[in-house]
Amino acid sequence: AASAVASASKSQPTPAISQFYSVVREETRGLPDRTVYRPADLKAVGPDVPVIVWANGGCRHANVFFATALSLLSARGFIVIADGAPEAVSTLSTAGGAQPQRMTEVIDWVTKSKDAKKQFDGRASGTRIAVIGQSCGGIEALVAGADPRVDSVVSVNSGLFANGALGYGRDRLNELHSPVLFIHGGPEAIEYQNSVENYALVDGPAALVGAVGAGHAGIFYGIRDNTQDGTIAVLEEGVTVLVQWFDYTLNGNSAAKAYFTDPSGLSSVPKWTVETKGLQP
């Protein structure tokens, strides 16, 4: 896939973070057990809408737990295709582990299927595609990210294990060819060490972002510092991180890249940390 980062035009696109579209949640036509989150009026977004493939935590084929975050992400001008049917609540993987091939199946469907072309009125991009996942889904994304059609990879509260747990070792990181974002929930989160060590092992462009106090899934549930009543700010801030990352890596918006590299960006937001290496203009 052509890298939007490498081919960004001199005229920057309208920042994705400043856009907000009504969102439709629907099934995928001709592809079982997936859910589409998309702007209701794709024509208003443009002729080539970036595609984000999502994998859930717990190796589950159910995305309802992440519906709020995925809807808010899609509202910024992205087609998000998540594992699990719209009505699925808690469907475990029948294979008992990570299944990154389910992400590449979605990419195949988007780029080759007549059903997908019809569902998106030919507006789903086949050259601006990202993979992202939470926990087990992050492992799936890191493995699926080796696919040459992938332009951006995000691992949320995850990372490949040194012992190859869930079937994939850290050698897989050598196969990544596009920018990678690792997000963790702070030093006390169970995935923290994995995220930090994976980031260190990646040779290419990458960012390591921490939502201090959010724990293993707080940025999706709006929970920080173990509060039971929720801290909705961390959900909004987490979605902003994702929107800025995809605006940079899929849309080629250098202003979005600055959110990760400039002192006035994410590093100025309370209880967030950021480290980057090799991010291109």
Regions found by a protein language model. Name each.
Residues 4-47:
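N-terminal cap/lid segment of alpha/beta-hydrolase-fold proteins
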Residues 41-48, 92-139, 255:
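Gly/Ser-rich "nucleophile elbow"/oxyanion-hole loop immediately N-terminal to the catalytic nucleophile
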Residues 46-57:
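Short beta-strand element of the alpha/beta-hydrolase
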Residues 52-54, 80, 208:
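Hydrophobic beta-strand anchors of alpha/beta hydrolase catalytic cores
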Residues 63-83:
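Short amphipathic alpha-helix adjacent to the substrate-entry channel of hydrolases
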Residues 213, 223-281:
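Alpha/beta-hydrolase-fold serine-hydrolase catalytic core, especially in secreted/extracellular enzymes
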